[in-house]
């Protein structure tokens, strides 16, 4: 058994351990406060919530429709589907920062005469890459409408009070039948980092040294935590 640790790990862990909130409560609070309440505070109109498939699963694991409607959100729509323009309402996007999601958001504001929504609040599950950020910066109409831009660091499903699911259907196959170009361990590590960010934890990392899979995930997780 091996361990990665940082000098700040114990201090951060002791501070967060005082909290009695469950993981599920932390995720729910983060979504309600950092996403919906934040957008509501900057919007004078009713809002439309637009989510990609992954964001929809993340939200559905902790938040009900009543919670959403309480925040002046009148409609919930899927990003990938054809949607009716509602230029009198503000759009709240909660999506993963994939190329597909970014391209769809840009398409919503590609026609200056027919913008999909009024003002825009952009919330991303994970950090936006430099390449995707550059594409957003070049979209002048979209830029003029952005009132919120935030990366909330939630990339897992909080299905129970203190357990979570990474929602990776092909994970086992990719890890066991790994090719030299496989990124599975880095993706898993990145998702685990969002769990720690949600809990405000900086953990000690213990792993089975004889397992190359465990070593790779532990090393990647450690690197992303300290970066």
Each model region followed by its residue ranges:
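Extended, well-folded catalytic/binding cores that form a central cleft or groove in large enzyme
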Residues: 1-227
């Amino acid at each position: 058994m091996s361990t990665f640790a940082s000098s700040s790990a114990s201090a951060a862990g002791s501070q967060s351990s005082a909290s009695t909130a469950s993981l599920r409560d932390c995720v729910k609070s983060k979504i309600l406060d950092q996403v919906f309440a934040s957008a509501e505070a900057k919007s004078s109109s009713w809002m439309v919530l637009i989510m990609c498939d992954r964001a929809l699963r993340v939200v559905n694991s902790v938040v009900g429709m009543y919670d959403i409607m309480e925040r002046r959100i009148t409609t919930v729509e899927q990003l990938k589907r054809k949607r009716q323009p509602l230029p009198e309402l503000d759009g709240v996007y909660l999506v993963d920062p994939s190329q597909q999601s970014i391209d769809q958001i840009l398409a919503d504001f590609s026609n200056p005469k027919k913008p999909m929504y009024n003002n825009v609040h952009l919330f991303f599950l994970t950090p936006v890459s430099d390449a995707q950020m550059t594409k957003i910066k070049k979209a002048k109409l979209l830029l003029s409408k952005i009132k919120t831009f935030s990366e909330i660091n939630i990339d897992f499903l909080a299905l129970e009070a203190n357990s979570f699911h990474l929602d990776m259907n092909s994970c086992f196959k990719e890890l066991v039948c790994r090719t030299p170009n496989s990124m599975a361990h880095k993706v898993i590590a990145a998702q685990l980092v969002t769990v720690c960010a949600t809990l405000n934890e900086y953990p000690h990392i213990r792993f089975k040294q004889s397992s190359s899979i465990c070593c790779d995930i532990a090393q990647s997780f450690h690197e992303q935590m300290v970066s």
